[in-house]
Amino acid sequence: MSKKLLAVIDMQNDFITGALGNAQCRAVVSNVVKKVNHTDADIVYTLDTHGEDYPDTQEGRKLPVKHCIKGTPGWELIPELEHIQEKTHFEKNTFGSTHLAEWIRKQGYTEVELIGVCTDICVISNAMTIKAFNPEVEISVDAGCCAGVTPQSHKTALDAMKGCQIRIEE
């Protein structure tokens, strides 16, 4: 019997309209909301989560834009997804979440679909981490519900995931 999970990656204000938002990310919001509202799968979501010390971290030194500081409006889920706030979620201070990957294994999911932002950073990192922890789980990414930092980096990430046996839904 199939046990399905929809993983919504980092659909937070700072990635859509805030510090790191871009037109590509804003453009997929309606697709993401539609997918969330019509899925028959369980739903989990991730929150990129940093503290005030973000500028002193390795990521902060390489990407010196404060974002997703816990407790700020930028850290929160976008308003269109507030209705899933009570779902299981994972705060992560890095691109991928090993806790999410372990949880998927413990819950016995057989299929995991990822949607969200950014394709070329956190979506690919979580897809690959989940794949490493759960090699027999069917993993897919809905390209129309993801966006990258740039259109080219989005495409490159999708191609990389496809090469690692992650199904890409165009």
Located regions from the model:
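Short phosphate-binding/catalytic loops that engage adenosine nucleotides
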Residues: 109, 135, 166
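A short glycine-rich beta-strand->turn/loop micro-motif centered on a GG-aromatic cluster
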Residues: 113-117, 137-149
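Internal catalytic-core helix/loop-beta-alpha segment
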Residues: 71-121
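Active-site acidic carboxylates
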Residues: 1-89, 149, 155, 159-163, ...
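Short acidic/polar active-site loop segments enriched in Thr and Asp
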Residues: 41, 110, 137
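Short active-site-adjacent structural elements
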Residues: 121-124, 148-151
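Histidine-anchored nucleotide/phosphate-binding helix
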Residues: 32-38, 124-134
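Active-site beta-loop-alpha junctions enriched in small/polar residues
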Residues: 48, 95, 144-146
